[in-house]
């Protein structure tokens, strides 16, 4: 409350009477009502309701053409004319966001991707930057180009840690030690500035707030948790949106608006909150927030993908919402690790979640799979059978008996729309990570015997990688680090712990030799990363207990 009282003293008047000064409450772009073809267009309410009519909530929604407004009836009845006018102006959103969020009318062309350089145009040289990376999909989303920049003061922030670890202890103590050594060993970056947090679970939020400096920018890909983090900070420290003009002057909301933090804190937060959505690239402009005594900037997400294909074109909308909405993640999988069993077959038996990928174990292998991706799983005789079933599901308009297992659209109901990847040799367990989708844990059981490489077929345009199981890796590394008083590294130095996969031709029979060939090509300019290049591949895989993770190599 002290922070809020301080904010109320000397607060600068913020006029809501001229709508052109207001930004879209969802994407932060400047609103305009002149040209429907240009960004920021909104439909102006025809008129404000007459206070004598005591309108209900549905009337207000109609005036905003179903835009995002959640006023309580009690607040309206107290002073309908005043509160309705102010809240309409503060919560109005542009036509693009309204269509996408409330009418399921999503046009990818209206949500253009931005590059890193596009976004850095918003960030002055020498600024404090928080590079936001979802830990659940590590190492995907981690951008060395951001961490290595000399013109920025960059801190790595690993979000969604509750989707990897059982409790806060590992996140607070063990992750920073591991990441310091990982960055040094893998990327030659010497940095102590790493935080692992969970905005939903409030893990390390106080520590994060105490650390970040005034005028800090949040930088990362779309849907990595920037807005969720901001909203957690706003609630915890009574934060609010501010405007900063070209001279650096901070324009805060009016005293009347700020007073609502006392009288109606729930509605106050709804007005001030950052727009959180499962839709990527929703944020189109920089939005500044006053969080306690500090200014924090939410930047639009940037893309590093070379593919023009979007998940919205491939995956069913309902499935995609489950994949992207962090609050829907079921943490019981982290604690219980319930697995499904699958045996590799001579017909190419496969495991899938919604048709988003097809995992094909080698013949005779016995596998356990722990799924951290929402949606029911299904096994098929082979990939062709799975694709045929899901094609029928799309043609049946939901009446097919297996429709609940189908999470893809008809555009990828052909085998040619998938890429075949070979997973480099491993022993024990690995985690397969799909960018913007999630991960699964794959474990081979029984006495080790090489039976062939595992394969995974993925729609073109989706990025994939593997890692050693992250929680166990960090826990065991920390134990080793403590027992040796820091002499032993928390992050293994004797082997790579992450790797890209190797694309194979659909008819490639000798995948092991093909993997070695691709490995040599990928490491041609990184000779120091090469391992076991003189070993025969088939001899090498007989001794994985001693020669771990051969042909593992991650391309940043």
Curated annotation (Swiss-Prot):
Q: What does this protein do?
A: Interacts genetically with prohibitins and thus may be involved in the mitochondrial lipid metabolism.
Q: Which organism is it from?
A: Saccharomyces cerevisiae (strain Lalvin EC1118 / Prise de mousse) (Baker's yeast)
Q: Does the keyword Transit peptide apply?
A: yes
The record's section on InterPro entries has: G_CP_dom, GTP-bd, Mito_lipid_metab_GTPase, P-loop_NTPase
Localization of this protein:
Mitochondrion
Gene Ontology CC, one term = mitochondrion
Main location per the UniProt record? mitochondrion
- The UniProt record lists the CP-type G domain at 113-305
Which protein family is it in?
Answer: Belongs to the TRAFAC class YlqF/YawG GTPase family. GEP3 subfamily.
The record's section on CDD domains has:
YqeH (cd01855)
Keyword Transferase listed: no
Q: Name one GO molecular function term.
A: GTP binding
Kindly list the cysteine pairs connected by disulfide bridges.
none
**Transit peptide feature range:** 1-21
Q: Which gene encodes it?
A: GEP3
Q: What is this protein identified as?
A: Genetic interactor of prohibitins 3, mitochondrial
